[in-house]
Amino acid sequence: DSVYTFTPLGEKASNISETHSLIIVEFLESSNYLEELDEREIVGLISIFTDIKVCEEKRSSIPKTENGNLKRLIRDIMDRFETYARLENTYDIHSGYNYDNGLMMDMIDPMISWCDLQDTQQCKYFIHSVLNELEVGLGDFSKGVLKISAIVKEWVFLCETFGFNELYHKLIKIDEKILKFVATTQSLYI
């Protein structure tokens, strides 16, 4: 009888389902668990995994941010996506993951800005200015915020399970920065 066991990478990846599990775990390890990013930057990074529908003319295939650390880390993720897409194609593997539109580059800085908003007036202004300019609907934005929250929860569990304390302490602060106005129990939308 054969006994199958997870590799260390596979054990960590088995806790991830909101994003490409192997890419995320490899990326987190190579970036030393995002030690150089703060909570806001982590939100910007995670926003690339949302499916917030930005107006076609304003959509970008490269990271839309002036933050050099984020650009570098997102390019690393993009390279990993290309590598896995190529591997799956070469070995005729059909994982079901859609590599063609797997990353959304347009909401990085807007999501970082969203983290900084303090009250309802600022949130309303953001919705009427930033989201309207990008032609992003409030429903799509809310779903994107909830997706970020779901990814954060997975990463929190990963950090708790494997003892990545520095990242854990950053991640547990994120929901309070993003789940406001459009994505809370008191919100007007949900």
Feature annotation, model-predicted:
Residues 1-2, 39-190:
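Acidic, serine/threonine- and proline-rich low-complexity intrinsically disordered segments
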Residues 2-35:
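Accessory beta->alpha helical hairpin/"wing" motif in late/C-terminal subdomains of nucleic-acid enzymes
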